[in-house]
């Protein structure tokens, strides 16, 4: 059994008792007399200055008057006693009287990676914690474990008409052999379905190797704790709803699996602690924050090559957006302009300095940020950049729009090219004389020394049709042959 007890000075002290390997019991402060093997050492203080044995049973009037407690229960199982692949524990957080959300993680998850996923407990946490080692395999439960599981199920699922005394002679092996009809003989049908479904879930679902809370870090060098961690166990945290307001209830969630598992809910009994068994108050700073431990991507390494390539105009004058990319490609310019993440957003930390450098590049000494910002608005319609709303001096490049803007366009002269000059129109004009097309360049008119016009065609061969002077009939003209018949 592993217990952690704080002193009023808020220092964590170890209160560990040796539990033999064959004794896997779900112990409570009000447990049965055979559990009185454990002992606890309280920290020295004005109120708690002695080492005392825990009472095997606390009178009812004592624990009813105690403040609500937050109980941590750790289930431990020997790998040789676990069936199938159930060689690792599970951790869930449940609010009494509330709902608990959880799902298993992959088997073999390390403690460090799990601590990164845990939610930071409320800083004003004043609850007590207690860790108890119990078997993770339901077949290893004792009758006391079965009783505590039933008590937890009644509170967690709001079950009615469940008589725990009817299960007092049933241990884990007998419980796992019970059928639905056996459950219905002891409790109503609705309760039987809930209990049987959750029992099957505990038996069939592989449990990841996880631990529960910050006390592990304080006790991580303890050989007994390391033994309990290496042998496998399940840690369950149960904060009391009367301590936390509903808005700040602590719920631990896991990534969803490819299949939809049944309702994820760890179980345990609720313990009422004596004043001597107050647990350590975990410090919020003891839990590492996921945001601080995630590797931060360097935007200059990711966007640097792209910025350098786009900032080079090749031939011609550099544009303003290219000048900004040129500044952003070098991290030494972060005193005046810097990337804000890796999505193309940037911020001018010193806009006047950026405007001054742009004025030097363009030989405009009167350049200021007002003029520069007006020039940047021109790029909004071009889909080159946009203004980040709600942030001063913050803009965002649209690299997709820049890629479209840099695509080469055909020259405008080709749009007015004569069709005969286009390559695909060559065969169409190969034989214009067959299509009765007029040649675009008519031949020059023939000019003779005797006449402006060429020799007459047959239309002007009639003797009476000599309209123009100096016309003569061709020498090959034949006389009429009609005279031979008359």
Curated annotation (Swiss-Prot):
GO CC entries: cytosol; nucleoplasm; nucleus; ribonucleoprotein complex
Which compartments is it annotated to reside in? Nucleus; Cytoplasm
DNA-binding residues (ranges): 318-398
Q: Which PROSITE patterns match?
A: ETS_DOMAIN_1, ETS_DOMAIN_2, ETS_DOMAIN_3, PNT
Q: Where are the Phosphoserine modifications? A: 55, 88, 103
Glycyl lysine isopeptide (Lys-Gly) (interchain with G-Cter in SUMO2) cross-link, chain position(s): 289
Q: Where is this region: Disordered?
A: 41-62, 79-99, 249-311
GO MF assignments? chromatin binding; DNA-binding transcription activator activity, RNA polymerase II-specific; RNA polymerase II cis-regulatory region sequence-specific DNA binding
Q: Known InterPro entries for this protein?
A: Ets_dom, ETS_fam, Pointed_dom, SAM/pointed_sf, WH-like_DNA-bd_sf, WH_DNA-bd_sf
The PNT domain, residue ranges: 120-206
Extent of Polar residues compositional bias:
41-54, 271-284
Q: One Pfam family, short name please?
A: Ets
What UniProt keywords are attached to this protein's entry?
Cytoplasm, DNA-binding, Isopeptide bond, Nucleus, Phosphoprotein, Transcription, Transcription regulation, Ubl conjugation
**According to its UniProt record, which protein family does this protein belong to?**
Belongs to the ETS family.
PANTHER family listed in its UniProt record: ETS (PTHR11849), TRANSCRIPTIONAL REGULATOR ERG (PTHR11849:SF216)
Summarize the subunit comment.
Answer: Identified in a IGF2BP1-dependent mRNP granule complex containing untranslated mRNAs. Interacts with SETDB1.
Role, per record: Transcriptional regulator. May participate in transcriptional regulation through the recruitment of SETDB1 histone methyltransferase and subsequent modification of local chromatin structure.
Q: What is this protein called?
A: Transcriptional regulator ERG
């Amino acid at each position: 059994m592993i217990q952690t007890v704080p002193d009023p000075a808020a220092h964590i002290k170890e209160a560990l008792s040796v539990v033999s390997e064959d004794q896997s019991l779900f112990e409570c402060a009000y447990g049965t007399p055979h559990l009185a093997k454990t002992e606890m050492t309280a920290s020295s203080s004005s109120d708690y200055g002695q080492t005392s044995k825990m009472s095997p049973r606390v009178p009812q009037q004592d624990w009813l008057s105690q403040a609500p407690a937050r109980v941590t229960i750790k289930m431990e199982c020997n790998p040789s006693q676990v069936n199938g692949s159930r060689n690792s524990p599970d951790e869930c957080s449940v609010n009494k009287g509330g709902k608990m959300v959880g799902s298993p993680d992959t088997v073999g998850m390390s403690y460090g990676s799990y601590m990164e996923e845990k939610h930071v407990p409320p800083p004003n946490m004043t609850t007590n914690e207690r860790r108890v080692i119990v078997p993770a395999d339901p077949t290893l439960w004792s009758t006391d474990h079965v009783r505590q599981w039933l008590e937890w199920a009644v509170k967690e699922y709001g079950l009615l008409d469940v008589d725990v005394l009817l299960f007092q002679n049933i241990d884990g092996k007998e419980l796992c052999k019970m059928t639905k009809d056996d459950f219905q003989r002891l409790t109503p049908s609705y309760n039987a379905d809930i209990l049987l479904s959750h029992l099957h879930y505990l038996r069939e679902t592989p449990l990841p190797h996880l631990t529960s809370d910050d006390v592990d870090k304080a006790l991580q060098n303890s050989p007994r704790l390391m033994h309990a961690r290496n042998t496998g166990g399940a840690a369950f945290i149960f904060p009391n709803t009367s301590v936390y307001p509903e808005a700040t209830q602590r719920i631990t969630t896991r990534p969803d699996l490819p299949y939809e598992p049944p309702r994820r809910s760890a179980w345990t009994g609720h313990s009422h602690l004596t004043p001597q068994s107050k647990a350590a108050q975990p410090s919020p700073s003891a839990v590492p924050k996921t945001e601080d431990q995630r590797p931060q991507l360097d935007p200059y390494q990711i966007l640097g090559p792209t910025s350098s390539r786009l900032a080079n105009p090749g031939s011609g004058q550099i544009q303003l957006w290219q000048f900004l990319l040129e500044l952003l490609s070098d991290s030494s310019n972060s005193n005046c302009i810097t990337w804000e993440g890796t999505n193309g957003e940037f911020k001018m930390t010193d806009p006047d300095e950026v405007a001054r450098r742009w004025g030097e590049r363009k030989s405009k000494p009167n350049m200021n940020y007002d003029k520069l910002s007006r020039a940047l608005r021109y790029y909004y319609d071009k889909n080159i950049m946009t203004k980040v709303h709600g942030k001063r001096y913050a803009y965002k490049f649209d690299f997709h729009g820049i890629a479209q803007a840099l695509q080469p366009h055909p020259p405008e002269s080709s749009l007015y090219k004569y069709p005969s000059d286009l390559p695909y129109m060559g065969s169409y004009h190969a034989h214009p004389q067959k299509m009765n097309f007029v040649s675009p360049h008519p031949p020059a008119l023939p000019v003779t020394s005797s006449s402006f016009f060429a020799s007459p065609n047959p239309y002007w061969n009639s003797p009476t049709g000599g309209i123009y002077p100096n016309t003569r009939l061709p020498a090959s003209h034949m006389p009429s042959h009609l005279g031979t018949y008359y």
